[in-house]
Amino acid sequence: MKLKALILDEKAMNRTLTRISHEIIEKNKGAEDIVLVGIKRRGYPLAKRISENIYKIEKLKLRVESVDISLYRDDLSRLSDQPAIKKSHPIDVEDKKIILVDDVIYTGRTARAAIDAIIHSGRPKLIQLAVLIDRGHRELPIRADYVGKNIPTSRDEIVSVEISEIDKCNSVKIYEV
């Protein structure tokens, strides 16, 4: 893989997450009844950061939950394009405003599986989607409500989101395969 571009460095990522936090507050007329649900793996730490930002702005501590969505894969090939919902703790979503958080939206399949998991847990007041990066190429009619950055990509490129909680650094890069 060859590095094509650095899209966000640490400062730009922090500014982007701060903007998303403000947009969530503005669109929801405050932060009451909001539960942030991060899609594991990188969506969960991003949801925690958004929660911290909202606390700084509104002085309101939000609940942060996670949902584990992953693709069935073996070491050599993809066995299925369908995301698998792994069992995680039940999320109380009843009559709450759910903000689903992920690092990258691509085909929309992961977001769809996460929405299904949330609806299976109860009846939320609403579900909104916040993503750090929207790279296009949707295969389902799913659109993020909050987007950090739109990055037009080819299907041959890889968008790599690195966050300090997992990767020891914060950046978004595009690689050519």
Swiss-Prot record:
Enzymatic class: transferase
Assembly behavior: Homodimer and homohexamer; in equilibrium.
Location of the motif PRPP-binding: 98-110
Record carries keyword Plastid: no
Catalytic activity as recorded in UniProt: UMP + diphosphate = 5-phospho-alpha-D-ribose 1-diphosphate + uracil
Purpose: Regulates transcriptional attenuation of the pyrimidine nucleotide (pyr) operon by binding in a uridine-dependent manner to specific sites on pyr mRNA. This disrupts an antiterminator hairpin in the RNA and favors formation of a downstream transcription terminator, leading to a reduced expression of downstream genes.
Organism: Clostridium kluyveri (strain ATCC 8527 / DSM 555 / NBRC 12016 / NCIMB 10680 / K1)
GO annotation terms (biological process): DNA-templated transcription termination
Molecular function via GO: RNA binding; uracil phosphoribosyltransferase activity
EC identifiers of the protein: 2.4.2.9
Listed InterPro entries: PRibTrfase_dom, PRTase-like, PyrR, PyrR_bifunctional
Pfam families for this protein: Pribosyltran (PF00156)
Record family assignment: Belongs to the purine/pyrimidine phosphoribosyltransferase family. PyrR subfamily.
Keyword entries, A-Z: Glycosyltransferase, RNA-binding, Transcription, Transcription regulation, Transcription termination, Transferase
Name this protein carries in UniProt: Bifunctional protein PyrR
